[in-house]
Curated annotation (Swiss-Prot):
The keyword Zinc-finger does not apply. PANTHER family: BETA-GLUCOSIDASE, BETA-GLUCOSIDASE F-RELATED. Pathway: Glycan metabolism; cellulose degradation. Belongs to the glycosyl hydrolase 3 family. It catalyses: Hydrolysis of terminal, non-reducing beta-D-glucosyl residues with release of beta-D-glucose. One of its GO terms (molecular function) is beta-glucosidase activity. Its EC number is 3.2.1.21. It comes from Schizophyllum commune. This is Beta-glucosidase. Keywords: Carbohydrate metabolism, Cellulose degradation, Glycosidase, Hydrolase, Polysaccharide degradation.
Length: 192
């Protein structure tokens, strides 16, 4: 519950009004044909994708609670693909609580940039617009390693268990996150 929220669309639209450019948007994450149509007519296309925690307080795509995979919600991969197929200057903005697998689109030749904003808060719009317009240079540091495949991570989603609360023995010791990748010779998509 924010006292106010500045969305990326609001902030980018305000910047566009200042410099005389035009913003056309689609707020549907499932209408990939419309997104591609808008993108085809634009000089630059910005695609926002997300994945939240769940934590039992919401249900998304039939999943109540924690994420059950490392994919963008609402078929975000298809949305990015459709927009990138239509626009040679596509920027992907990712709002997510943790890593998602980006392999479906990260090597697309029209994806020119990725802005990984994580959970930017009530000033989300201004922070993303500042980066996109070059007012600030993002740090380029991630708080975690992003893999190329969910199988690259040591722990997998436990879909079923006979135990009320599964036992976790943490046998990996200090080999968590980037240490796991280094120790096992796994090349991540984006390093910690």
């Amino acid at each position: 519950e924010f006292p106010y929220l500045i969305t990326p669309l609001d902030a980018i639209t305000a910047r566009a009004q200042e410099d005389g450019t035009t913003v056309t948007s689609s707020l549907s994450d499932s209408d990939t044909a419309r997104a591609a149509q808008i993108a085809a007519a634009a000089d630059v296309a910005i695609v926002f994708i997300s994945s939240d925690s769940g934590e039992g307080y919401l249900t998304v795509e039939g999943n109540a609670g924690d994420r059950n995979d490392l994919l963008a919600w609402h078929d975000g991969d298809a949305l990015v693909q459709a927009v990138a197929d239509a626009n040679e200057n596509t920027i992907v903005a990712v709002n997510t609580v943790g890593a998602i697998i980006t392999e479906a689109w990260i090597e697309h030749p029209n994806v020119k940039a990725v802005v990984w904003s994580g959970l930017p808060g009530q000033e989300a719009g201004n922070s993303v617009a500042d980066i996109l317009y070059g007012a600030y240079n993002p740090s380029g540091r991630l708080p975690y390693t992003i893999a190329k495949s969910a199988d690259d991570y040591p722990a997998q989603v436990l879909y079923e268990s006979s135990a009320q609360v599964p036992d976790i023995d943490y046998s990996e010791g200090l080999l968590v996150d980037y240490r796991h990748f280094d120790a096992n010779g796994i090349e991540p998509r984006f390093e910690f």
